[in-house]
Amino acid sequence: AAVIAGARVGKGVVVVRSPKTGKWNPPAFIKSRQASWGIQAGIQEAELVLLVITNKGLKQLFRTQYSLGEGPQIAIGPVGKTLDLNLDKLLSENDILAYSRVKGLFAGLSFDGTIISSDKHANYEYYQQAVSNRSLLIGKEGINVPESGQAFLKRMNRH
C-alpha cells in the first residue's frame, strides 16, 4: 500500500416515477467521476443504485452536477463493504440513498468525493435531440422516445 491518488469513472441512467401520473418518465443518462487520495491498494468493480427519497433529492438530479460521499471513508475487502465516517451526513435526513455492490479486493483509508453529472452526449445520442435531464425526469411533453425506451417504459409501468 502507498499514499496514492485514485480515480473512477462510470455511466448510468436515472428514471423517475411521476408523482402525478404514477407512470415512469423517460430515462436520463448520467456519468460519475470519483477522485480519492490516501493509503489504498486493490482493484474493484462496483454497481451503484441511487434511491431518491425526497423532492429535494430529485431537485439535485435536475442540476448539471452534484456531489455524493465527500469525506473520509474506510473500505474493507474482499466483499466491498464500506464504512462511511462522515457522521454529519449519516445522521442528517437523507435525500438520496446510495447502495452499492462491489466485487474485488480493496483496503485502505482515503478521502474521496464523487460527482454525478448529466451525460448530455448520451442523451443526445439516444434521443437524437438536445434534451436536459430535468426535462426527462419531469416527463416534459414533446420528447421523441426511441422504441427501446418505449419498451423499457412499458415494462416499468407494469409495476
Model-based region annotation:
Residues 1-159:
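Small-residue-enriched, tightly packed secondary-structure blocks
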